[in-house]
Amino acid sequence: MRPTPLFFALLQIALAAKRADQICNDHCSNAYQKQQSCGGTDDVSSQSATLKCLCADESYWSELASCDCSSYDSNVSAQDLRAYYCNVGVTGGSQGQSTSGDANAATNSNDATGTATDAAAATNGNDGASGTADANNANNTDGSGATDASNTNNNGSTDTVNTNTAGSGSSETTAAAGAAAGTAAGTNSASDQANETGSDATNAATGSDASGTAATNTASTASGATSGSGSDAAKKTGTNTDSDSDTATKGSDATAGSMTTAASGLGATNGTSNSTGSHSGSMTSITTGSGFTNGTSSRSGSGSGSSTRSGSNSDSSSSGSGSRSSSSADSSDSDSGSGSSSTESGSGSGSGSSTSSGSGSGSGSSTRSGGFAATIPTVTFGSLVALALNLL
């Protein structure tokens, strides 16, 4: 079989391509060895230092340009790399190496050279003209000390730990009192030891203001109620009503505390409740819940009017011998149970309504509807059974 011209043509093309590949491999191998001599590796992070080291090596750039075999970025030509890192073929200054520093080198990531005289050196951490971008700047030259952490400025407008003399700092609440305003409460000559006058609601327990303002009060001032002698008009708190619990511990002028009418809630009175006087008109007591009344509840007086118990009352007594009594000035009703559980609940099943009325003379009518009507048929049926047995 004779070889055709086409076969020889294809063979020549293949051999030429192989020789070209070998030439490129040689060029790239030489370029890679030169990179290693400058300490460069395949790591992109070392690209800047390695290429700057090879800026003056013409053979390196020639090898690299023969096949564009950059080991860093195959998409960037050798010419572009040299122009960027070596300032070759670029006018108007470079973005890389420079001995005196570029004016627009703010884009540099703090290269070894080129940022010493940058105008936009705010990202370098160096001290600037105003020190606003300094990481460790104490702002010693600031007149106002607005950003000082622990300054000793005279105005102290925003000091955290100030030693102000003018007293305009935020932590000094009594600037008019001067240095005496911050003295301890024990040295306040105008305040009593126990704050006996005690008309100040916040001083009833401690006897002195926390900020020491009681030291400046006198007996004749309008605000002297916290440290006056007794002639202050603002000190007279004896006219407070019985419901003011705050005045119960405020000195001798407080008339509250003698009344113990602590009845509250919906009729559940715990402890002893005594109320004297004349209770006239309509008096309604509504008991809700379990109906247990702890303690003693007594009322004395004329007792005229009506007493009505309504609602969903449930009086339960489960002890051995329980009793429930309700006494007023004009009526009395009582229930007693022995050894059993007596329960009144619901409507029409033992609850009913208990109404006592009269004119206070002790007479009246007590009506109970419902009651224990369910027990009557039980007793009658038992009696009939017993009678039938006796007859037999």
Swiss-Prot record:
Q: What does the entry list under GO cellular component?
A: extracellular region; side of membrane
Keywords attached to this Swiss-Prot or TrEMBL record, sorted alphabetically, are: Cell wall, Glycoprotein, GPI-anchor, Lipoprotein, Membrane, Secreted, Signal, Virulence
Q: How is it modified after translation?
A: The GPI-anchor is attached to the protein in the endoplasmic reticulum and serves to target the protein to the cell surface. There, the glucosamine-inositol phospholipid moiety is cleaved off and the GPI-modified mannoprotein is covalently attached via its lipidless GPI glycan remnant to the 1,6-beta-glucan of the outer cell wall layer.
Lipid moiety-binding region (GPI-anchor amidated serine): S363
Q: Where are stretches of biased composition, namely Low complexity?
A: 96-147, 162-191, 199-232, 251-371
Renumbered residue ranges of the record's region Disordered? 95-375
Q: What are the Polar residues biased-composition ranges?
A: 148-161, 237-250
Q: Which residues carry a glycan?
A: N75, N139, N155, N195, N270, N274, N294
Q: Where in the cell is it found?
A: Secreted, Cell wall; Membrane
Q: What induces it?
A: Induced during yeast to hyphae transition, during biofilm formation, during oralpharyngeal candidasis, and in response to serum. Regulated BY FLO8, NRG1, RFG1, RGT1, TUP1, TSA1, and UME6.
Task: Specify the signal sequence span.
Answer: 1-16
Q: Name the membrane topology term.
A: Lipid-anchor; GPI-anchor
Q: Which domain of life is it from?
A: Eukaryota
What job does this protein perform? GPI-anchored cell wall protein that may be involved in cell wall organization, hyphal growth, as well as in virulence.
The record's family statement is:
Belongs to the IHD1 family.
Could you tell me what this protein is called?
A: Induced during hyphae development protein 1
